[in-house]
Amino acid sequence: MANRKHVSTLLRNIYNLGRDVNAKFNQVWIYAGAMVIVTVPVLAWLTIVLSIDEPFCQNLLVYYGLNLIHVSEGQNCNFMRFLLIFIQFPVISMNTATAVLYVLLCCFSRNILKEYLSNGEKVSPLDCRSFKRYLIFYEQIFEVLSSLEASLSFPILLTVSNNCAFIFYCFMALDPFGKSPWPLAEHFYNFTTLTFLISLLSFLCVTLAASSVGDETKNAKQIQEKLLQRVLASTRKPDRDELMVLFVTHKRPAFTLTAWGFFTFTKGLILPAIGSISTFSLLILQIDSK
């Protein structure tokens, strides 16, 4: 409940900051995100229920029901279709909703930073007072990003970890090089392929969206330094010391989003992560094939 309040406050703060800098929030992104949250679990469910037959459903029912659930003959698939809704939907829906929410918040924050940079190039007249307002507004952005980190860094860690685990499992199950001694059952081929693509896209979208926020904060620091040089050049010498104190007082480092502090989201994370998963999967397949 507390985390829900934090997210609500975060959404309100992002909206207010966007309004202050005239940042545009495309509502199409919100509608598209809502469609993704609904569509992904439904597709995952359909890829299984449309490809299973009665004997396979009976085996699944024994597995999930611990041999304690018995239904009349010919009704195993109908019961499993109903049961899979409660098995699949909570996990897939939660992971998808977390990833979509995180990506949207990162994109909105990036848009705010872009408008902040654009406004910095148009500051006029450029004096100590306007420069101070510019620095104070960045502090507000910094606080919102800190709130984003505090509220969603742990959920996004679980989501990204889940994505990596699914990529690893699906890569081994699909066995693109024919190394596995236990080929994937044909009933799960469509589901495994879909899960692999969804997990990969989720990992890429989360990483790229989060890293774009860090890139914009680095650009913001460069703009602030350029503005400082311009203000110093047009300021009388007695006021320069006060200006430097102002800059140091309101100075904030570039902000990098993390997954609960375990790793930072940068574009350089993508290739090592995917390469490590692929290498380890091939190693396991090679060992199993011997």
Indicate residue ranges for each PLM-predicted region.
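Membrane-proximal N-terminal segments immediately preceding the first transmembrane helix
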Residues: 7-22, 62-75, 133-143, 243-258
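Hydrophobic alpha-helical membrane-embedded or membrane-associated segments
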Residues: 99, 103, 158-161
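Inner-leaflet juxtamembrane helices
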Residues: 1-15, 102-113, 199-227
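Short, Φ-rich (hydrophobic/aromatic) sequence segments
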Residues: 112-116, 244-247
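Helix-loop-helix junctions within predominantly alpha-helical proteins
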Residues: 17-98, 114-133, 170-200, 287-290
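Terminal membrane-anchoring module of integral membrane proteins
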Residues: 36-37, 128-290
